[in-house]
Amino acid sequence: MTAPPIRHVPVLGREAVAMLAPRAGGVYVDATFGAGGYSRAILATAETRVIGIDRDPTAIAGGSGLVEESGGRLILVEDRFSHLAAVCAAQDAAAVDGVVMDVGVSSMQLDEAGRGFSFRLDGPLDMRMSGHGPTAAEVVARASETDLADIIYIFGEERRSRAVARAIVGARRHGPIATTRALADIVSKVVRAKPHEIHPATRTFQALRIFVNEELDELIAALAAAERVLKPGGRLAVVSFHSLEDRIVKNFLAWRGKTGGGSRHRPEIERAPPSFAILTKRPLTPGDDEVQANPRARSARLRAAERTDAAAIDDGAELPAWPSLANVMRGG
């Protein structure tokens, strides 16, 4: 008799679903379906419906069992989570009761050498979540030294970004940098780490992954889309894993949760009513038991907010001036 498959337990899963507070008959969006942990927990509440979104076709295929088990209450859509408003509209769910997001790379992606996300497993230098668009190997081969340095500094917060970029450009003159191990070896020669510190290539790999998948642009767009689709009283829960993501979520909710501001030096400015009420004044973090069971959970942060009845705030904010995948790949 074969043992049943181990069910994926998402980081801060219990806390995130508690923040959503699923109710019978509610419609929820699992914007980063992954292995389906959040969806399964939401579906445990009677008569709930879940729209699961993931840009990774492997995740969508892997969720077929849960779709069948749910009796039609789970619908899976292969798409970017920045498109969640359009996905919801296509499923006759223009307004929903909750949205949960688990931002960044999944354990499944990290643990599969062929996906090229991890410096710990040798494989092709790919890093694409969807399988579409330029690979990390193509970025490393074509980006200028200046662009590489900016990418590694901005998205990886690597202080030695210029030295890493210089080493990459020097190495690629002798042949393609096609594997994760090849890149990790190049970075390790210029970034030194003590035994108790993170691997020297950690920040460079993070930077390339974020850049290849346009993760921060996607997150900004997804937060705004969630604001548009949530009903009054609907809830948003976001789990992030590094400071760049968490800062975006924190700033978005802080801006959307303010009623105005001013001081004796500066009169209060007129602004729209807040579209969110913050539920987590400080982010929730994993307990010791969860970190011990899953060391990758150590950096996780959960922030949540409840949608007010105010209109979504269209502030026309532009994306920050960081390197663009399209511009870098065409040499612009």
Swiss-Prot record:
GO cellular component, one term: cytoplasm
Principal localisation: cytoplasm
GO biological process: rRNA base methylation
One Pfam family hit: Methyltransf_5
Name of the top EC class for this enzyme: transferase
Annotated residues for binding of S-adenosyl-L-methionine: G36, G37, Y38, D54, F81, D102, Q109
GO molecular function: rRNA (cytosine-N4-)-methyltransferase activity
Signal peptide feature range: none
Localization terms from the record: Cytoplasm
Cited InterPro entries: RsmH, SAM-dep_MeTrfase_MraW_recog, SAM-dependent_MTases_sf
EC number per UniProt: 2.1.1.199
Family: Belongs to the methyltransferase superfamily. RsmH family.
Stated role: Specifically methylates the N4 position of cytidine in position 1402 (C1402) of 16S rRNA.
Protein name per Swiss-Prot or TrEMBL: Ribosomal RNA small subunit methyltransferase H
